[in-house]
């Protein structure tokens, strides 16, 4: 099954376009609960309650930092493996933001799709087409989300720079993503943040007729609103089933923003937040 079909299928099955980010805040974990046990507990409860989360996005960096390879310690990789094995049957997006010369990208592509068995991966476009093609050629059934207009405050430093024709760089990148989508496979998508709704609307409108998958961070702790994002996509005619709206710490560590310790009823609080988010992202 190609990636766009997988997105459509799982959006309909879950009646949602939600994506749960897995970005552990280690200082906010309950005392005595390991990172793998923490997330596996939440994932099992999601499955038991039938909560419709339509994709999952673990960030590999949070787990790589736990490894100490020179000491023979791969506890971070093992924790991530345990979490991946516990995921429900929705698309698994490996958030690794790779992108390098072709030979290096080929190895990063195998890392994502061969080693971790991801359905999709995030990559940077900065090094051009030969850094992207290894993720697409030979992996036509996979998804490749290319950073377009990111949700972080520093995204504007380069992405909003005006080109000679007056277009912002992020729009030139969008045009390039659309070209690569046609050239390589329909699984080429874009990462477009929800923290600037005017820019989001411009990009959603551009992508609406091209059926390019969107991964939308910036909702929850970063301030974006799932309801506003969905309203915009409906208004511009973007096919909702190809979108995934991501929220991470607001679902899995709601107390972290206030720098509070994990409460005793952490599981119930998280599941309530996850359930609410899934409904906010309903089709």
Residue ranges and their predicted role:
Residues 14-18, 51-54, 88-91, 117-119, ...:
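Short, well-ordered coil/turn segments that N-cap beta-strands
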Residues 20, 56, 95, 121, ...:
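Conserved, mostly hydrophobic/aromatic
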Residues 65-86, 101-105, 126-140, 195-206, ...:
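Active-site-adjacent beta->alpha loops and helix N-cap segments on the catalytic face
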């Amino acid at each position: 099954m190609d990636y766009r079909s997988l997105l459509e299928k799982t959006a309909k099955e879950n009646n949602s376009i939600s994506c749960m980010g897995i970005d552990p805040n280690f200082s906010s974990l309950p005392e005595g609960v390991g990172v793998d046990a923490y997330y596996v507990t939440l994932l099992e409860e999601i499955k038991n309650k039938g909560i419709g989360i339509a994709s999952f996005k673990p960030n590999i960096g949070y787990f790589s930092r736990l490894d100490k390879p020179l000491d023979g310690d791969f506890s971070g990789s093992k924790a991530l493996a345990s979490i991946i094995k516990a995921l429900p049957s929705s698309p698994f997006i490996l958030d690794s933001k790779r992108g390098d010369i072709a030979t290096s990208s080929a190895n990063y592509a195998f890392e994502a799709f061969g080693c971790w068995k991801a359905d999709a991966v995030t990559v940077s476009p900065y090094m051009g087409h030969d850094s992207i093609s290894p993720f697409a050629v030979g992996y036509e059934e996979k998804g490749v989300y290319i950073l377009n207009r990111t949700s972080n405050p520093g995204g504007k430093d380069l992405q909003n720079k005006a080109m000679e024709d007056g277009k912002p760089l992020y729009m030139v990148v969008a045009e390039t993503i659309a070209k690569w989508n046609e050239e390589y496979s329909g699984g080429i998508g874009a990462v477009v943040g929800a923290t600037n709704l005017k820019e989001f609307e411009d990009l959603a409108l551009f992508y609406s007729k091209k059926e390019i998958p969107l991964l939308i961070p910036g909702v929850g702790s970063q301030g974006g609103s799932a309801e506003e994002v969905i309203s915009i996509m409906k208004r511009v005619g973007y096919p909702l089933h190809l979108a995934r709206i991501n929220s991470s710490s607001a679902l899995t560590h709601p107390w972290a923003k206030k720098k509070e310790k994990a409460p005793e009823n952490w599981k119930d609080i998280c599941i309530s937040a996850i359930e609410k988010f899934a409904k906010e992202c309903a089709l």
